[in-house]
Amino acid sequence: MLIDRFGRPVTNLRISLTKECNLSCFYCHREGQLDGERFMTPEEIERIVRVASRLGIKKVKLTGGEPTIRKDILEIIRRLKPYVVDLSLTTNGTTMYVLAEKLKEAGLDRVNISLDTLDRKKYKMITGFNVLDEVIKGIKKATKLFYPVKLNMVVMKGVNDDEIWDMMRFAGEVNAILQLIELEVPREMENSQFFKDFFYPLKPLEEKFEKLAVKVKERRMHRRRKYFIPIDGKIVEVEVVRSMHNTVFCMNCTRLRLTADGYLKTCLLRRDDLIDILGPLRNGASDADLIEIFKRAVLLRRPYWTSNSS
């Protein structure tokens, strides 16, 4: 198993399959990626994951951009599944109604679907497109095939902070888990007008959940708390993702990232931590060479939010 200098095991690999997306969400961080021209093939992704699995990485999440716009998405899933115990996908849901059954057959274990609002006008304002109805259909289809389905809601001040309870009800109706996510930016953007305008702190809401929940669990990943809250006769599972200045969140991160153009990346918010793995692979690197590249990347890992930065 890979363990960094801070004693944190690395068990998860988050792979961006593309920087492209069929929506244009105004807050999107693009998985912390910069522009690049390289493009990983299914064979190259498979080899990297095969090597990662030898190092104890058994959970892989496919992201983007929007990963399902890759025409070879089913091939990628089929290639990766033999090497991992948990293969998941984060998607905007626009293709889910059409692809859900094929994704399941290819070997996908579970899905996270982005859904920031249930209001058509707001959805178009946030994403630039009027496709909310298709996404809702896709969510309902996904919940019949996958468990759990998680709905990712980035909570933004003055945009959708008035919809949290409605989203909880919807999650209960479709038997999904709701993830409430704080808007996240790097340190240099904390004083930006964008952050001041849209950041909505989730700590007060989490304190309210503590009182309302019939049960509370804590995940190993980031020590995120999961609240089981009664609403309209159902128990809805709500997970709060609160990363800004959260030292506990960082100290319990078990992720490594692979960018769409083939760089290992140790942290979403860092841009000084890229380690090229695709270049050496294309230049004939052996599996032993690729293992050393993984080890080098893990040595670079350090918590973004610390007691000195919080």
Curated annotation (Swiss-Prot):
Pfam families: Fer4_12, Mob_synth_C, Radical_SAM. Its EC number is 4.1.99.22. Gene3D superfamilies: Aldolase class I. It comes from the Archaea. GO terms for molecular function: 4 iron, 4 sulfur cluster binding; cyclic pyranopterin monophosphate synthase activity; GTP 3',8'-cyclase activity; GTP binding; metal ion binding; S-adenosyl-L-methionine binding. Its cofactor is [4Fe-4S] cluster. InterPro entries: Aldolase_TIM, Elp3/MiaA/NifB-like_rSAM, MoaA_arc, MoaA_NifB_PqqE_Fe-S-bd_CS, MoaA_twitch, MoCo_biosynth_MoaA/MoaC, rSAM. Binds 2 [4Fe-4S] clusters. Binds 1 [4Fe-4S] cluster coordinated with 3 cysteines and an exchangeable S-adenosyl-L-methionine and 1 [4Fe-4S] cluster coordinated with 3 cysteines and the GTP-derived substrate. S-adenosyl-L-methionine binds at residues 27, 65, 114, 189. GO terms for biological process: Mo-molybdopterin cofactor biosynthetic process. GTP binds at residues 14, 61, 90, 150, 255-257. [4Fe-4S] cluster 2 binds at residues 250, 253, 267. Keywords: 4Fe-4S, GTP-binding, Iron, Iron-sulfur, Lyase, Metal-binding, Molybdenum cofactor biosynthesis, Nucleotide-binding, S-adenosyl-L-methionine. HAMAP family: MoaA_A. Catalyzes the cyclization of GTP to (8S)-3',8-cyclo-7,8-dihydroguanosine 5'-triphosphate. Belongs to the radical SAM superfamily. MoaA family. This is Probable GTP 3',8-cyclase. It comes from Pyrococcus horikoshii (strain ATCC 700860 / DSM 12428 / JCM 9974 / NBRC 100139 / OT-3). The lineage of its organism: Archaea, Methanobacteriati, Methanobacteriota, Thermococci, Thermococcales.
